[in-house]
Amino acid sequence: LSGNYDCILTGASSQSNFCRQAVAAANKLNLDSFLVLMHGIKGKMMQGNFLLYNILGANVDVVEGEDLEQIPKHLDLKYNELIKEGRKPLLIYGGFGKEDTVLAGISYANAMAEIDLQMKDQNFMADHLFVTAANMTQAGCELGAKILNWPTRIQGVSPVYWEMNIKKDIARICNEGAKMLDANLEFTDRMIN
């Protein structure tokens, strides 16, 4: 991590796996973490990742609404607030920043390599993999599966409703990730399940 940061700032839905991972990484780096979250249809009950943010010591602001595409606006407001307080935040747009989505997708492709080793140890190959994913997770799984030449069908189950064409965004993340990894692969939205 380059830069003179003293905290991270990111946001998504209240049950975001990405936010949970970001908070855990910040803790490992001895950085404070700030989250801007929307409950949406998930409700306000302290459970799952929303509970883990609390256990991990994240500073959480919950904004009202159900349109997650409004999160970047709220992140910018929180960023300015932290700057005024003298903090030095690393702003991570996560699923809302095009470069962030590609890097996160690549991290999930790397996780697929770990799964590949485990399956080989068990002399097993999955024919289907179901992932709860908004965009980055599924993109990384799709990318990793193709790089590893798996016959596996990746089936995404999105916990989030998006106005944008999410299959096109997943294909974009796959294509940009493949390019960064020098993998000669091409994805279309028709390939995404």
Identify the role of each PLM range.
Residues 40-121, 184-193:
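Small/polar-residue-rich loop-to-helix segments that shape phosphate-bearing ligand pockets
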Residues 152-193:
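Active-site/ligand-binding loops adjacent to catalytic centers
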